[in-house]
């Protein structure tokens, strides 16, 4: 590749990221659903479950977190609280209107609007988290993520069941797993659930791989149970190909085979990643 075309757009007149705490995951997810179904033009929207919320606050390393934690608990935002971060990008007029309408919807579901401090912290550190993987590995901790998408009717139950399946997969080994999730990409008809899990490395690489497969398999079976797609944006690949037929059915798989055969009759374009 020697040339590329890129899209450009004007810098926005205004852009900020805001934080909102909800008393529970149920209230937060309903607020997210209503924001997107009302087509508010937010540029970013994310809801962390209670465990991810606490992990995010702890890892922020900010001195104000302890004071904020105490204050939140005093007014009813305790162990089940969830953090939403949303962004608004555009003209000043659009910015003000969207902020006003989003804040009103959040308050409808018990949301506590906390301004831009939390959102700004996320904005500054959002690309740093992936670099923790190597440091954690050197410290004896493995980290992985998995993502999927489901209709709204299944989001609430599946968002708890998927991390729980990962935890239970390791319980027979008397191993603890830190598994949490957030809603990332959201749509009028559903949302992507993004799960992160951390677990202790074993001395033997083969045993570590086997345990990882156990967790991945149980999470994938749970996802299938709730009718989700095996991947939202990471792709199917060799890790997920086993679960694709159950999602697409015989006719769907035949269609995929036909498309690949038509565009790649010699099987040269990354073969073996779907079937």
Language-model-detected regions and their locations in the chain:
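FAD-binding core of FAD-dependent oxidoreductases
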Residues: 1-12, 230-236
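General beta-strand structural signal in soluble alpha/beta enzymes
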Residues: 2, 43-47, 115-116, 232, ...
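C-terminal substrate-recognition/cap domain of FAD-linked oxidoreductases
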Residues: 8-10, 21-22, 29-218, 226
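Short, conserved aromatic-histidine micro-motifs
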Residues: 13-31, 215-220, 253-267
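Small/polar glycine-rich anion-binding or flexible loop at a beta-alpha turn
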Residues: 49-51, 186, 229-242
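Shared catalytic-loop signature of beta/alpha-barrel
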Residues: 203, 208-210, 215, 222, ...
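Activity-critical C-terminal alpha-helical subdomain
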Residues: 236-275
């Amino acid at each position: 590749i020697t040339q590329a075309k890129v899209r450009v757009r004007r810098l926005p007149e205004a852009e900020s990221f805001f934080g909102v705490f909800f008393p529970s995951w149920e209230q937060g997810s309903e607020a997210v659903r209503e924001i997107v179904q009302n087509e508010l033009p937010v540029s970013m929207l994310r809801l962390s479950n209670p465990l991810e919320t606490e992990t995010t606050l702890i890892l922020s390393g900010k001195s104000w977190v302890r004071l904020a934690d105490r204050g939140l608990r005093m007014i009813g935002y305790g162990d089940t609280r969830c953090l939403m971060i949303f962004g608004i990008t555009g003209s000043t007029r659009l910015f003000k209107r969207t902020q006003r309408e989003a804040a009103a919807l959040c308050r409808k579901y018990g949301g506590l609007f906390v301004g831009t401090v939390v959102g700004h912290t996320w904005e500054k550190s959002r690309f740093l988290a992936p670099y923790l993987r190597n440091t954690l590995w050197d410290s004896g901790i493995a980290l992985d993520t998995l993502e999927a998408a489901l209709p709204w009717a299944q989001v609430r139950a599946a968002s708890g069941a998927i991390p729980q399946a990962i935890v239970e997969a390791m319980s027979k080994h008397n191993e603890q797993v830190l598994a949490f999730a957030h809603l990332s990409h959201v749509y009028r008809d559903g949302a992507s659930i993004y799960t992160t899990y951390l677990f202790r490395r074993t001395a033997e690489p083969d045993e570590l791989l086997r345990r990882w497969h156990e967790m991945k398999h149980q999470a994938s079976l749970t996802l299938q149970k709730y009718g989700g797609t095996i991947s939202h944006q990471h792709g199917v690949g060799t890790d997920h190909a086993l679960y694709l037929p159950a999602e697409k059915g015989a006719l769907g798989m035949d269609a995929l085979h036909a498309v690949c055969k038509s565009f790649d009759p010699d099987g040269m374009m990354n073969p073996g990643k779907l079937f």
